[in-house]
Amino acid sequence: GLSDAEIARGLARYETVGRRSRVVKTGYCTLVDDCYNANPTSDRAAIDSLASLSGRHVCILGDMLEMGGNAPELHRSVGEYAAAHGVDLVITQGELAKYIAEGAGTAGAHYPDRASLLAALPELLHEGDVVLVKASHGAHFEEISEVVKQLS
C-alpha cells in the first residue's frame, strides 16, 4: 500500500477535469468554478462544499437545463436550499435561474442578462468572499468565472 505521505502528495497534485469544482484562490476571493454541469443534486452538493471554506459564501447560479416541466420548482428548491444552508448571497442570471433567486428569498438577486450581472459583480463581491459559479455548460458561465478571477 501507499504511505500517508504518498497519499497526501498524490492528493495535492489532483486537478479537476475541465470546469468541475475547480477551486482558484485569486488573492481577492476564492472561486469555486463549476461551470460544466448543473442539476438540483449537483447544485446542492456544491453548496454543501462551501461550508468547508471560510468567508462570506456567494453563489452565482444559472439555468439547469433539461429539467422538464418541473423546471421552475426544481430551480426554486435550489434557492431555498442555498438560503437554508448558510449562503449569504445568491446571484442568478438566466430565464429559469430567476426561480433560484426567488427561492433564496432576501439572499437572492436576479439579473435579467449577462451584461447587467457582469456590471454589478464589482459591487456585489467583496475581498475574502468564497464564490461558487455554477450552471449548465450551455449557459456559458465560464465568462463569469473569468471576470471573478480578474476582480481586485
Regions found by a protein language model. Give the residues of each.
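ATP-dependent carboxylate-amine ligase
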Residues: G1-S152
